[in-house]
Curated annotation (Swiss-Prot):
EC numbers on record: 2.8.2.-
Gene from which this protein is expressed: ppzF
A GO molecular-function descriptor: transferase activity
Enzyme class: transferase
InterPro entries recorded: P-loop_NTPase, Pyrrolopyrazine_biosynth_F
Keywords: Transferase
Protein known as: Sulfotransferase ppzF
């Protein structure tokens, strides 16, 4: 139950790839949290099927602006976004009918409006097409800061948490996983654009929720606490922050898990390859690895390492993305939840 209203609450963990979201879910031990449900694929990702189409290397939609998509491609994607949304709706109704609060994670890239995606990837003049919005009985408003396919009215039924991580750690980490999945040649050929690793969308949604605090589903005296921002550094180095967060969202801090068993080789062999590529370090761990924090990191030094690891062209592109994301990251970091 929500600590604020006494009713089942909807908690949205909004992130970008490689922000230690799987580590956070591991620590929260959602399966052990009373009166909480976390569904979809691995705690959420209801809109992953749409992203799978957008990033399918066979049809190369990800390499083209929305203005160059065929009618069939548009229809397929619109149908998929709607199907994802309806699946999420059915799951929500089931969980809430049992009196359970929900905790769901989603990467911004998974439920991003394709017009916003094209403008980010190809420039603001890539399309003047109106934003895509799924059909929802509760409303169809789509304001400027809302970069998702979800209408404002639906977003405002959730209490949002934004998970961030230093771009100089998150961005190259994501590129490494793409190499593991697709090979270096394919990843490089796409010039990293397919990853759409951006903090801009998280900031935009954060500002959307700040502007609409009065409409959030919590008691008036709690609204200034939302939206919440968590930095991966604090999850890694300051467990008290997770305990505080747990208390704020109505979870039981006694269920938090900071140590676990390493997966055995036979267990790893049963895991889907793409999932292994994204989570191998977590599966092989027995607890939090404090070396994963950004403490003392220097972008100039990291860029030198990237050139050695990825080659000059890819490294320069990653560096450009990292430097371009720092203002949004620092903006959100300054507003993060802290236990001290």
């Amino acid at each position: 139950m929500s600590a604020n209203t006494g009713k089942p609450a909807r908690h949205y963990l909004i992130s970008y790839p490689r922000t230690a979201s799987n580590l956070l879910l591991k620590i929260l031990a959602l399966d052990s949290q009373p009166n909480f449900s976390s569904g979809g694929f691995d705690g959420g990702y209801f809109f992953m099927p749409a992203d799978d189409i957008l990033t399918d290397p066979r049809i190369r939609v990800r390499a083209r602006s929305i203005s160059d998509w065929t009618a069939d491609e548009r229809a397929q994607l619109k149908e998929t976004f709607q199907a994802c949304f309806e699946a999420q709706q059915r799951w929500l109704e089931s969980a809430e009918s049992q009196g359970q609060s929900v905790f769901v994670k989603e990467h911004t890239v998974f439920f991003a409006d394709p017009t916003a995606r094209s403008c980010l990837q190809f420039g603001p003049s890539a399309t003047s097409e109106p934003a895509w919005t799924v059909e929802y009985a509760g409303g169809s408003t789509h304001s400027k800061l809302n970069i998702t396919v979800l209408p404002d009215e639906f977003l405002l039924t959730w209490l949002p948490t934004f998970l961030i991580r230093h771009p100089a750690l998150a961005f190259p980490s994501l590129y490494r996983t793409v190499i593991k999945r697709e090979g270096k040649e394919s990843a490089a050929a796409d010039n990293f654009a397919s990853l759409l690793t951006t903090v801009e969308w998280s900031r935009s949604l954060y500002d959307f929720y700040v502007q609409n605090r009065e409409s959030l589903p919590c008691s008036p005296d709690q609204r200034l606490e939302w939206p919440i921002v968590l930095d991966a550094d604090d999850i890694i180095a300051h467990p008290a922050t997770v305990t505080l967060y747990c208390d704020k969202i109505g979870m039981d801090p006694r269920q938090l898990c900071f140590n676990w068993d390493q997966l055995k080789s036979e267990e790893l062999s049963k895991i889907e390859p793409n999932q292994l590529a994204m989570r191998m370090s977590l599966y092989q761990s027995t607890g939090i690895d404090t070396s994963k924090s950004s403490r003392g990191i220097n972008v100039d030094d990291e860029a030198t390492k990237w050139r050695s690891e990825f080659g000059i062209a890819v490294a320069d592109h990653i560096e450009k993305l990292v430097r371009g994301a720092m203002a949004d990251y620092e903006y959100l970091r300054a507003r993060r939840l802290r236990a001290d």
